[in-house]
Amino acid sequence: MSQARVIYFGAAAIYLVGAVVQFFLAGLGVFGASSYDAHRAFGLILVLVTLVLLVLSIVGRMPRTTIILTVVLLGLNVLQMVLANTDVGEIAALHPVNGVVIVFLAYELTQRSRRYVASKMAA
């Protein structure tokens, strides 16, 4: 079994935790801290983790659906930055909705990679 697959699973789990942390940081921006600087900076880190996930999914020869969903996750991350930087309120309001979709997709990718790694280890 490819090490990239195991690393993908670990990185996906880290990404999932990071996506949840993003909600906390956004909450701090609303209810505590005076700015969203930590939320913005951490969001950029998550984009980089998504790029790493994409490379690992390809190098590790993950199932095609996992690779495609990883590309979708990257696209949602880019969309997240666009939504956060628009001046149209109705469009910007989709930013937290997209964040929820990102968390669910990150969970799905973590579960898929866990099952895939477990099945390859058992074989």
Which ranges hold each PLM region?
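Polytopic transmembrane helical bundles with strong interfacial aromatic enrichment
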Residues: 1-123
